[in-house]
């Protein structure tokens, strides 16, 4: 008897992929950007989900290369004290995604961790390109660290999190915080992060480039919306996988979650290995039978993998924000 290592998709995931195929929706590059964004919103709304109660506050802060950044602050309902904070940077290929499409997921995080969640509505591509969205994410994190009292959070107890393109920017915000002397970040949670450029040529890209939700063609298109100038394709602030080990040293402890059937799987795991090699406390978990976006897509919210991965992320964030002693001494060097 031989062991069969071929991926087996979760039944709900199989159904979801067939549903999308039967729907016959156009590829993201075949429609206008506004139409693509509307398609994503509709895709989330098609699947009603239970949402945890939360306090929600939208505001505009005076930072960033364009002068202002919009944020949404979520807190557990009825909680009035000063809370630690999770800065959340959303995915969607730098093109799609907003606070509305992430509402269910953000409410889960704030209730499970007991932390406030600050969701950054960075200006999306192609209207704004690298490095503007990244700099807006960094500027928002810096503002929250310095002005936490204005939004009733403890800016000295901050973690960052993000998925896909947002996972890219979440970890690069940690790079910038180290390089620029702050803010202090206690942990980073990266969910199926985009860490390389489309030329990386991984095995997972070859194996899952078609038919598994995020295609290699779509990822190439998303990348060029964010980084239109190929001269930036190896810049570590766009491509964190290419960062030298000394740049990774002393970054915050990391949790990286990958999906087995995802074009971005291998680059996320390669980045985890780089972090570990640089001495960063790193946990990387691959969820079998899962596809890209499985934690945030409403249609997959009740799958065993989404439930387990979300619980793992929330437990890590809660511990990091409640136990300062768990942070290695050298990681306070860029306070």
Where are these regions (language model features)?
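Short amphipathic alpha-helix adjacent to the substrate-entry channel of hydrolases
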Residues: 100-119
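Short beta-strand-to-loop junctions in surface cap/lid or active-site-entrance loops
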Residues: 64-65, 71-82, 241-248
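Gly/Ser-rich "nucleophile elbow"/oxyanion-hole loop immediately N-terminal to the catalytic nucleophile
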Residues: 145-160, 180
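Alpha/beta hydrolase fold serine-hydrolase catalytic domain that processes acyl esters and thioesters
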Residues: 155-156, 171-335
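A glycine/proline-hinged amphipathic helix-loop "lid/cap" segment
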Residues: 1-73, 232, 304, 315, ...
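Short beta-strand element of the alpha/beta-hydrolase
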Residues: 82-92
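Gly/Ala-rich beta-loop-alpha elbow adjacent to hydrolase catalytic centers
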Residues: 162, 166, 170
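Alpha/beta-hydrolase active-site loop
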Residues: 128-150, 313
């Amino acid at each position: 008897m031989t062991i069969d290592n071929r991926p087996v998709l979760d039944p709900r995931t199989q159904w979801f992929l067939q549903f999308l195929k039967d729907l016959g929706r156009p590829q993201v590059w075949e429609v206008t950007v506004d139409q693509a964004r509307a398609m994503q919103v509709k895709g989330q709304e098609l699947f009603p989900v239970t949402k945890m109660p939360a306090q929600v506050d939208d505001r505009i802060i005076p930072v960033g290369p364009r002068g202002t950044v919009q944020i949404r602050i979520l807190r557990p309902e009825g909680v009035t004290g000063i809370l630690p904070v999770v800065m959340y940077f959303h995915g969607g290929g730098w093109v799609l995604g907003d606070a509305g499409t992430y509402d269910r997921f953000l409410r889960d995080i704030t209730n499970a961790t007991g932390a406030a969640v600050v969701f950054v509505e960075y200006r999306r591509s192609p209207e704004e390109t690298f490095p503007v969205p990244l700099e807006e994410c960094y500027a928002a994190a810096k503002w929250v660290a310095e002005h936490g009292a204005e939004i009733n959070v403890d800016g000295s107890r901050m973690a960052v999190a993000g998925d896909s393109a947002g996972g890219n920017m979440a970890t690069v915000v940690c790079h910038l915080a180290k390089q620029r002397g702050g803010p202090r970040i206690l942990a980073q949670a990266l969910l199926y992060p985009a860490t390389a450029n489309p030329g990386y040529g991984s095995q997972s890209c070859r194996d899952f480039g078609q038919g598994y939700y995020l295609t290699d063609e779509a990822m190439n298109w998303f990348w060029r919306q964010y980084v239109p100038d190929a001269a930036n394709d190896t810049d570590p602030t766009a491509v964190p996988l290419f960062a030298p080990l000394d740049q990774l040293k002393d970054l915050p402890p990391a949790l990286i979650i990958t999906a087995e059937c995802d074009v971005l799987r291998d680059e996320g795991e390669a980045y985890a290995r780089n972090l570990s090699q640089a001495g960063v406390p790193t946990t990387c978990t691959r969820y079998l039978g899962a596809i890209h976006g499985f934690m945030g897509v409403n249609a997959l919210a009740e799958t065993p993998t989404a439930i387990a991965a979300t619980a793992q992320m929330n437990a890590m964030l809660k511990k990091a924000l409640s136990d300062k002693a768990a942070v290695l001494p050298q990681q306070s060097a860029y306070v």
